Structure formats: structure tokens, C-alpha cells
Amino acid sequence: MMKSLFIASTMVLMAFPAFAESTTVKMYEALPTGPGKEVGTVVISEAPGGLHFKVNMEKLTPGYHGFHVHENPSCAPGEKDGKIVPALAAGGHYDPGNTHHHLGPEGDGHMGDLPRLSANADGKVSETVVAPHLKKLAEIKQRSLMVHVGGDNYSDKPEPLGGGGARFACGVIE
């Protein structure tokens, strides 16, 4: 009897995998004065095949937008070449291997390169993208998420860092 109970209990536990860690990141407009209005959320969760980023955002222009994990846990503006740049305090793309290459989510460059987002005609994004090189949420805690104004070609040519342009929205990964 005891052996049957043990086997049954083990089977039940195996049927329900351990809950993976997840966190919700609030995304705010990146403005020269600092974070603006909330424009959506990104739920990051651990899953087989890499971290999953469930994006629900609005107020973007229709089309593709670069999406990255940035180095620092800040969305504050900063000064570059005498000009105030929104969310500059977030730093550059997360690149723990110091590759200095922007090769996309499948490449061997920045670990923070995520699949680009696609906003519909109403400027909304509701999709889940996977970062195959990022396995644990702990790898990116105390960093930031960034959505750029334009698309991303995952190359440093003809424009640096994929040509995504200005920083549109930013959120800190707690």
C-alpha cells in the first residue's frame, strides 16, 4: 500500500513541472525629461528554448521595432555630444562576452539582441518572442528592456546597432 501511494505521488509531481520564474516589466515612454507614460508591459519567463518575452504594448508606429536588453537598470536620460538623449542611462546592448557585434537573437553577438517586434496598424504589439541565448531570468535582472523607434536588421551596417534609431520605450527588469 505504501509503495503504491509513493508511486502515485511521484507520478502526480512529475505531471506538474516546477514553476518557472517570471517577472513583469512596465514599459514607459523614453522622453528627454525621463520616463513618461506607461505604454505597456513585458512578462519575461523561463521556458525551454530560452527566455520568453510576452509583449503587450501600444502607441508605437506601425511596423518593426528593435527590441533589446540593455546593460543598466535605468531609463533616465543622459547627455551625449551636448544633447539630451532619452533613456541613455540604460547603456548599450547587454553584451557580457564583450563581442561588440550586433548579430541578432540567433547570432553570437550581443546576448541582449532580441527578436524585433511588429506593431499593427493601430500601433499595438501583442506577441511573445524567444531569446534562445538567455536561459535564466537571473542573467538579466537589474538591466533594462528597450524598444526602439525603427526596425532592426541585426547588423552594424549600413547603420550601427541595426539602424533601430531612437529609444522609444524603456523598462527596468527588477
Curated annotation (Swiss-Prot):
Cysteines engaged in disulfide bonds, as pairs: 75-170
Name of the protein in its database record: Superoxide dismutase [Cu-Zn]
Binding site residues for Zn(2+): 93, 102, 110, 113
Biological role stated in the UniProt entry: Destroys radicals which are normally produced within the cells and which are toxic to biological systems.
Gene Ontology terms for molecular function: copper ion binding; superoxide dismutase activity
Lineage of origin: Bacteria, Pseudomonadati, Pseudomonadota, Alphaproteobacteria, Hyphomicrobiales
Subcellular location: Periplasm
Lineage: superkingdom: Bacteria
Record's keyword terms, sorted: Antioxidant, Copper, Disulfide bond, Metal-binding, Oxidoreductase, Periplasm, Signal, Zinc
EC number: 1.15.1.1
Cofactor(s) this protein cannot do without: Cu cation; Zn(2+)
Main location: periplasm
Assigned GO CC terms: periplasmic space
